[in-house]
Every structure is written in C-alpha cells, then in structure tokens.
Amino acid sequence: MFSQKLLANGKLLSKLAIVSGVVGTATAITTSTTLLSDDFVQPTSYPWEHRFPWQSYDHAAIRRGHQVYTQVCSTCHSLNLISYRHLANVAYTPEELKAMAADTTVMDGPDSEGDMFERKGQVTDFHPKPYPNSNAARFANNGALPPDLSLVIKARGAHEDYVFSLLTGYCEPPAGVRVVGGQYFNPYFPGTKIAMAPPLADGMVEYDDGTDNSMSQMAKDVSTFLCWASEPEHDDRKKLGMKVLLGVSIIALPLFYWKRLKWSVIKTRKISFKD
C-alpha cells in the first residue's frame, strides 16, 4: 500500500533522490578526505611489559624517563598535571624530591600587599612551565604549539607505541617530498611534517644508574614515564583487580556448592499423578 502511494507521488520520489545524492556525495567527500589525511605510517606495536594484566610499571624506567623529560623535553613541553609529590615512592624518595623542587623558582602570591613574589619550589608544586603563555610558546616554535605531555599517551590511539615511534622515527624525506625550513620529516607524525626537531641523540642524557643511554633506550624510558603520568593509578588498579578476582574465586566455590545443594531437591523431584 505504501509503495503504491510512493510511486504515485512523483515529487516525493524526486526529493528522496536529491537527498540520497547529497548524502552519498557528502559520504564520498568525507571518506576521500580521511584517506588523504591518513598519509603516515602506523606505529609498530611493541611488547611493553606493563600492558600485561599481572605486570606493573618499571619504576626504574619511570625515574630514567623523568630524567629525560627534565633535561630534554621540559624545554618546550609542560607537564601541568604532575607535581613533584606524585613521584614520591614511585621514582624518588621524599628527600630527593624536596631537593629537586628546591632547585626551581616559583612565582607565588599575592602577598599581604597584593604583589606577586618568587619563592623556592616545594614538593606540592607542579612542574614549571617552559613558557608563560601559549603565544610565547608559538613564537618560540615557528608558530607550532608544543602540547602538554600530561595526557599525551591517552590522547594518541597507539599510546606509548606512538610516542616511541615518533621519537625514533626521524629520517630523510623520500624523493618527491618537500620539507620547508623549520620542519622535519617524520613518517609517524600525521602529515609526516613536524615542527619539532629530533629531540634525542645517543649519549644525550647521562643516567644516574649507568643504564645504556642510546636513543632508543631514552625513547623507551620517557615513553614509560609519560605512560605513568597519564595513569598514575595503574599499579594500584591492577592490585585491586587481582584482590577482587582472588576474593571472587574463593567465594565462588562455596556459592556453587550451596546453589547445587538448594536446587538439587527441586531439580530431582518427580511428580506422579494418580488415576
């Protein structure tokens, strides 16, 4: 009945055809735009130990990664959500953190007279920002705004694989690819042209524990540190999950026996009818 009315109404059919054409064209444009923008290499999936359900973060790697961030990455990138006290008993002792924070200068205030003043850093302070505002950051980086690294691992689909591949993936552009001044070729960056110069090189950071300071090792350590920074509760969450699973498994056996005991009478009963 509906199909007959639809065929009889020519105007309705023409409108439906126009709408279908517009939707199809929009879908094709969106698809082609997505394909054109996806001109970068997908990062390799690496076997990070902390990804396994029973594994925690490598806390020695977190300490080394924080050292790489402090000496290399902090010159351009902020870490707004991590204070020094967050690293206590994770990568440093409280005494080490107090000394580390005291080496920084923090703008505080206002005082009783309404003026801002400088003071030594405390463990409750967050890591200092490299630039006072976003305009200063853009001016110092050829118009590019260095992202905050607190949640950069969560903000990328490949997570720590992306950060590691990006840091170690700088190379010469292939034939036919033009890179203007102030940009560098990196096949793992969307668009393949990035304003950040290669940040790491072999031997750039001297580790306190004597670990090999190759570029790949530093990239691995700072990726682990940033992964922890994006999810500091990772280890506690896994510990709680293991406790819950252990408790449930212990309770499950007596509950199963109790269920069999209570339902055995109902499941095995027989009803007979007398004539």
UniProtKB/Swiss-Prot annotation:
Subunit structure: Component of the ubiquinol-cytochrome c oxidoreductase (cytochrome b-c1 complex, complex III, CIII), a multisubunit enzyme composed of 3 respiratory subunits cytochrome b, cytochrome c1 and Rieske protein, 2 core protein subunits, and additional low-molecular weight protein subunits. The complex exists as an obligatory dimer and forms supercomplexes (SCs) in the inner mitochondrial membrane with cytochrome c oxidase (complex IV, CIV).
Family: Belongs to the cytochrome c family.
The encoding gene: cyc1
Keywords, sorted A to Z: Electron transport, Heme, Iron, Membrane, Metal-binding, Mitochondrion, Mitochondrion inner membrane, Respiratory chain, Transit peptide, Translocase, Transmembrane, Transmembrane helix, Transport
Organism in which the protein naturally occurs: Dictyostelium discoideum
Cited PROSITE patterns: CYTC (PS51007)
Cofactor(s) needed for function: heme c
Record: residues binding heme c: C73, C76, H77, M196
Chain segments annotated as transmembrane: 240-258
UniProt topology in membrane: Single-pass membrane protein
Name of the protein: Cytochrome c1, heme protein, mitochondrial
